[in-house]
From Swiss-Prot:
Annotated GO biological process: L-histidine biosynthetic process
Family to which this protein belongs: Belongs to the imidazoleglycerol-phosphate dehydratase family.
GO molecular function: imidazoleglycerol-phosphate dehydratase activity
Gene3D superfamilies for the chain: Imidazole glycerol phosphate dehydratase, domain 1
Keyword Hydrolase (UniProt): no
Protein name (Swiss-Prot/TrEMBL): Imidazoleglycerol-phosphate dehydratase
Superkingdom as given in the UniProt entry: Bacteria
Keyword field: Amino-acid biosynthesis, Cytoplasm, Histidine biosynthesis, Lyase
KW Cytoplasm (keyword) present: yes
GO CC, one annotated term: cytoplasm
Native organism: Dictyoglomus thermophilum (strain ATCC 35947 / DSM 3960 / H-6-12)
Pathway of action: Amino-acid biosynthesis; L-histidine biosynthesis; L-histidine from 5-phospho-alpha-D-ribose 1-diphosphate: step 6/9
Amino acid sequence: MRRAEIERETKETYVKIALNLDGEGSFLGDFPIPYYKHLISTLCFYAGWDVEINAKGDIEVDPHHLIEDTGITLGKAFNSAILKSSFLRFSNKVIPMDEALVMVVVDISGRPYLEIKDDKEILKGRLIKEFLRGFVNNSQMTLHIWILSGENLHHVEEAIFKALGLALGEASKEVSNLKSTKGKIW
């Protein structure tokens, strides 16, 4: 079973995540920021992951700490679970949501890198970047996001999480042989 349970506790936050990569796309638990609960549950639904989360933090100060630490914890859980099998590794998805159009490309490579092409600076100053950076660095994957069009911030961010979920669901599929010219990822 490709499962992991990771707990992270700091003076600012507490995050515990149980992840099953071979699930049904269910999201259970408590996340005190409704918009980000919506985005994270969307990611898990489209990836086909079962996730149980318990998170709390000093959101009265700023939600930044909890959002970033949730990305870190989910990334660590993903990394721990994915290493229990061989997997497809690469995927890309282009997803529309009304006027928004987003392309996501992933490589579960063992080399963390995040690139967001956002010519209109739609995501400037948005905490979604902190979540994604924490997730990418701790899952040790390469993630490229291109915002091809969009005006409504909610549509753009939701399209990102849908595309990311679909791409990760495909890239994390079990295969008999992991493809790498090096012979291994990590």
